[in-house]
């Protein structure tokens, strides 16, 4: 049996998906169990690596704005 890492497993899971199916994978992962977070991270990494610096900065700006609207949970 071939050993595959997490990135490879996630890419394999979505490899032949249509745009609609890929949208479903993303939307069903958002807000789901935390086990879905690594998959979203791999997909985001793929987008990031193929983005121009201006697009990356736009994503960072959008993310920063969303983070600032959140209320941090205080550790007990």
Where are the model-predicted features located?
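Secretory-pathway low-complexity, repetitive Gly/Ala/Ser/Pro-rich segments with frequent Tyr
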Residues: 20-24, 38, 57
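Alpha-solenoid HEAT/Armadillo repeat architecture
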Residues: 15, 30, 48-52
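Short acidic alpha-helix initiation/capping motifs at coil-to-helix transition points
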Residues: 1-5, 34-40
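Short alpha-helix boundary/capping elements
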Residues: 18, 34, 52-55, 67-68
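N-terminal acidic leader/helix
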Residues: 1-28
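Charged low-complexity stretches with an acidic bias
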Residues: 4, 56-76
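Short, charge-rich amphipathic interface segments used for partner binding and complex assembly
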Residues: 39-64
């Amino acid at each position: 049996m071939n050993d595959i890492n997490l990135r490879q497993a996630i890419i394999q899971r979505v490899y032949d998906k249509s745009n609609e199916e890929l949208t479903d994978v993303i939307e069903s992962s958002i807000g789901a169990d935390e086990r879905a977070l690594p998959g979203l991270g791999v997909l985001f990494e793929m987008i990031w690596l193929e983005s121009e610096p201006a697009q990356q900065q736009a994503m960072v700006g959008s993310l920063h704005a969303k983070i600032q609207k959140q209320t941090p949970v205080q550790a007990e």
